[in-house]
């Protein structure tokens, strides 16, 4: 059975089962990777899942085994990539988790002292081990308490930037007291049903929580403009898109839940703070009532005191310190350890976020949820938010979330247009991944295209000719198709790419294209990049201005100083831009600054 014969011979030596596709993998293929017990307990559902993929012309291998380490799996994936044009894989059940160290320069925000902090906490769970074949790692050992965790240093002679060869997703059951194999069976049945829908991406919600983007309205409102560029026409119709912000309600949690429960909702993106067990939806509401504000402060003091007690700290000493600092008396701390006040404060706190226990009753229906947040996708945990979403009884089938903390000053909407054009989630993620980002759920899920003549999945898996992408760059009216063309030409080191990127930045009407040009030029770090930065500080798109000022500060070239000062004088109402201006000015001697 084609390449499967050779692989099958290898598999028995390792105690593995490999089932070759029923279709010959000519243009592309996919791998369903599972552990032996999950294969035995969920075989009908896994085979049904494979069948629906093959109906979509995606031949799928099944790789089942008692995996001893991540290298076993990676070797098979690399072989399928060479022999059968593998485009991606999904990990179902108990699949080894690479815990990456010495790679914090490749994360967007995660920084922790690897010498002083516990190894479990200071490592990044990352499936880039599996899907970026060029990365090299030095094996450190298996975790002593969790058999799934394997620690690696990023090797000194490894590439120090990501460029994924395939995509991956994880379907890892929760340890929440329910049968883990029934979770997988139910999920795969839901995923198969989702594949059989003819569902166009035309119902979208964005929610921005308290603290995101420094609560800047200027930064928040730009997302609406960007999405209209990426999905032209889709959101011009009434009620197809909704942009929600924490400040629209005192307690927005119920509004968010109502959105998640919509039967017709295709996609929801959260911009918020997070932990594995919680989404921080909002904070204490603003008030002009002194008595109400006083009660909010007392609740905060009670909460902080409980934290001190939980950590076996000096409660009396902390109260004395606060009384001195804030000129308070001890009545401000009254009830901190009273059961009735603890109950009341807990109820009040529950209004501010979505926690693990909330998700089953919410039963989210949004087919695809993006968590632009820290830790919501931390799959090393026994239970975590993104996992709860996909294993719920609702119609949510896939999430995109981060395993550690993540930077706010990054583009969260890259290449969204490809999702609307019917691209598999995994193929989209392959070009937007960072070290900590992961697909939780089925990476082959896609929306229907709704546009004649657009075969994005084939384009991304088979079209490597520069001529193809040059034609798309020249002729396509769609901003994100132009973006992908620029990215492909950049990766292929197309002659003159730097000048092409600068020209496109100077002439494109699309903010998303201009940002792509600037970010790719940053990797080249040439004179064109510096000239584009000077133009970028007055771009209509706030995010471009924000990032341009930040990069000027990192470079610290004297030629940038007049542009930074001009921005300080003229763009002071853009909070995030202004913050970056003040930070950038620290790179310059005070004697050079004249305002």
Give the positions of each predicted feature.
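Conserved small/polar residues in nucleotide/adenosyl-binding loops
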Residues: 593-595
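Short inter-helical turns and helix N-cap capping residues of alpha-solenoid HEAT/ARM repeat scaffolds
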Residues: 477-478, 509-510, 540-541, 572-574
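Bacterial Sec-dependent N-terminal signal peptides
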Residues: 1-16
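Caspase-like cysteine protease fold
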Residues: 412-496, 512-515
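Structured catalytic cores of large enzymes
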Residues: 7, 71-250, 259-267, 276, ...
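Loop/turn elements at helix/coil->beta-strand transitions in domains of secreted/extracellular proteins
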Residues: 27-29, 56-60, 84-88, 199-204, ...
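Structural detector for internal amphipathic alpha-helices that build alpha-solenoid repeat scaffolds
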Residues: 458, 480-493, 512-525, 545-557, ...
């Amino acid at each position: 059975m084609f390449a499967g014969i050779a692989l099958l011979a290898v598999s028995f030596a390792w105690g593995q089962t490999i089932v070759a596709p029923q279709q010959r993998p000519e243009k592309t293929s996919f791998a369903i990777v599972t552990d032996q017990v999950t294969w035995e307990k969920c075989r009908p559902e896994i085979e049904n899942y494979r069948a629906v993929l093959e109906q979509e012309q995606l031949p799928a291998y099944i790789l089942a085994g008692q995996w001893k380490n991540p290298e076993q799996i990676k070797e098979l994936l690399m072989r399928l990539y060479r022999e059968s044009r593998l485009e991606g894989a999904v990990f179902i059940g108990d699949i080894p988790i690479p815990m990456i160290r010495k790679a914090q320069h490749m994360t967007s925000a995660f920084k922790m002292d690897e010498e002083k902090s516990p190894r479990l906490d200071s490592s990044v769970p990352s499936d880039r081990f599996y899907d970026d074949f060029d990365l090299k790692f030095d094996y450190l050992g298996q975790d002593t308490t969790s058999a799934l965790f394997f620690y690696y240093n990023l090797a000194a002679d490894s590439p120090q930037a990501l460029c994924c060869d395939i995509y991956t997703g994880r379907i890892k059951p929760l340890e929440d007291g329910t049968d883990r194999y029934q979770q997988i069976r139910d999920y795969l049945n839901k995923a198969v049903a989702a594949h059989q829908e003819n569902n166009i991406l035309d119902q979208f919600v964005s929610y921005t929580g308290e603290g995101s983007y420094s609560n800047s309205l200027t930064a928040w409102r730009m997302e609406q403009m960007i999405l209209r560029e990426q999905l032209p026409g889709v959101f011009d119709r009434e009620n197809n898109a909704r942009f929600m912000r924490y400040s629209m309600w005192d307690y927005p949690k119920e509004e968010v839940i109502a959105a998640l429960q919509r039967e017709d909702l295709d996609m929801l993106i959260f911009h918020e703070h997070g932990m594995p067990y919680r989404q921080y939806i909002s904070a204490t509401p603003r008030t002009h009532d002194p008595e109400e504000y006083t009660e909010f402060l007392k609740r905060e003091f009670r909460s902080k005191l409980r934290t001190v007690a939980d950590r076996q700290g000096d409660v009396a000493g902390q109260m004395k310190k606060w009384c001195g600092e804030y000129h308070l008396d001890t009545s401000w701390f009254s009830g901190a350890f009273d059961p009735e006040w603890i109950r009341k404060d807990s109820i009040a706190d529950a209004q501010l976020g979505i926690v693990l226990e909330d998700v089953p009753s919410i039963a989210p229906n949004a087919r695809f949820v993006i968590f632009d947040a820290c830790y919501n996708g931390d799959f090393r945990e026994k239970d975590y938010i993104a996992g709860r979403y996909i294993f719920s009884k609702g119609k949510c089938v896939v999430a995109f979330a981060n395993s550690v903390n993540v930077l706010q000053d990054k583009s969260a909407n890259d290449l969204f247009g490809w999702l609307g054009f019917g691209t598999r989630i995994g193929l989209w993620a392959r070009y937007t991944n960072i070290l900590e980002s992961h697909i939780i759920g089925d990476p082959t899920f896609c929306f229907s295209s709704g546009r004649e003549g657009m075969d994005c999945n084939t384009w991304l898996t088979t079209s490597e000719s520069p001529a193809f992408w040059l034609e798309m760059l020249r002729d396509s009216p769609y901003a994100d198709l132009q973006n992908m063309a620029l990215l492909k030409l950049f990766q292929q080191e197309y002659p003159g790419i730097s000048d092409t990127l600068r020209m496109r930045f100077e002439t494109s009407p699309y903010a998303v294209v201009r940002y792509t040009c600037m970010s790719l030029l940053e990797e080249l770090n040439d004179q064109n990049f510096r000239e584009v930065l000077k133009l970028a500080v007055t771009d209509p798109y706030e995010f471009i201005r924000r990032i341009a000022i930040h990069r000027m500060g990192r470079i610290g070239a004297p030629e940038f100083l007049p542009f930074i000062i001009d921005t300080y004088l003229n763009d002071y109402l853009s909070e995030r831009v202004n913050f970056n201006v003040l930070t950038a000015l620290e790179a310059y001697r005070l004697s050079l600054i004249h305002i």
